[in-house]
Amino acid sequence: MIVVEQDLWIQAPMTEEVTANIMQDIAPHTKSLGNQPLTFIDLFAGIGGFHFAMRSNGVKCMFASEWDKFARQTYEANFRTIEPELFAKGRFAGDINAVNLDDIPPFDILCAGFPCQPFSNAGLKKGFEDTRGTLFFRIAQIIKDKCDKGYPPKVIFLENVKGLAHHDKGHTLDVICSVLDELGYRVAYRVLNAKNFGVPQNRERIFIVSWRKENPASTFHFPIGISADKKPIFNDEELKDLVLKTRVGDILLHNVEGKYTLSERLYQGHLRRKEMHKQKGNGFGFSLFNADSPYTSTISARYYKDGSEILIEQTGKRPRKLHPIEAARLQGFPIGKHFHIVVSDTQAYKQFGNSVAVPMVQTIASQIIEQLLMNTAHE
């Protein structure tokens, strides 16, 4: 995990000095299939969690799409210098539904952390048309378009909330798997937890990895964590014994401005609500953590409202919210040298709450790429 002092944080776009060595640092060797660079597209890109994870594995971004204007600001501030072609060629799009499919170049891996939406239950066909009107339908359209043109993506790499597995009584996930199967892909999925990938956050997400059926070695084995020496872990016994241990203190700043400390009024409100929930017999209410806590609860996009899901203990003071830098670290962003916050605290909390945990995606991506390269070597 990358930890820097607070004074290394820059709330502004990257300078030439900062970006001079970025290519070497985060993408030392561009991976290739044959004589062509390995490529991906970044849909529902947010602030670039997938982009950092893929680029650190030596994969080149060919196209990205994000509609939120503040997320676009953060994405552009962090990638314009290191991926100039993406912006110079107009390949950083807004609303993906407004994009002409011909404007999306061929690519090897499709990455998308897409919103969870219900599909039509009409007829329960679980086919391509059942997804019409949803954002997943657009993903399916892009895949189908490239397949029809003779450029089938090699891998589809998707992320969603854990609840997708049971959303609409399992119908939503069934439809996604059925559509990918219809498009020529063998599907694997698994719920993974960021706390097992070196991030001190209890954050469960479902990942879907799909390979072309004609690939003879298309079964994908998910890493379920990383060990202390940063090697992927694939079974539960190793996860229990070898997983990289984390603590919340790893991501905390030494000095945080007073404005992040809860006001007396807000803190008393939290205490009242927690007591009320306790009397009702449930565990709702604010969650308090300290430097020795192994991990926090899940940071969400609503964290900016009152911070109640993750509060940090302070000696002799009321608890405080996370600083935006800490929120970035909690998601594994390389804050400081390689990542910069260019929006308000409110927007930053939303952005990090909506993002993927970078080390988790990084580890899965590494396994995907290793298998792709191995398969290519045996062709």
Summary of predicted features, one role per range:
Residues 1-2, 10:
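Short, positively charged and aromatic/hydrophobic N-terminal segments
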Residues 3, 262-379:
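C-terminal target-recognition/interaction regions appended to catalytic cores
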Residues 7-9, 15-153, 162-167, 171-174, ...:
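Core alpha/beta nucleotide-donor-binding catalytic domains of modification enzymes
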Residues 78, 224, 313-317:
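Short Gly/aromatic-enriched secondary-structure transition segments
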Residues 99-107, 119-298, 302:
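Class I S-adenosyl-L-methionine
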Residues 113, 155, 321-324:
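Short aromatic/basic micro-patch
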Residues 114-115, 153, 200, 334, ...:
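Proline-centered helix-kink/hinge sites
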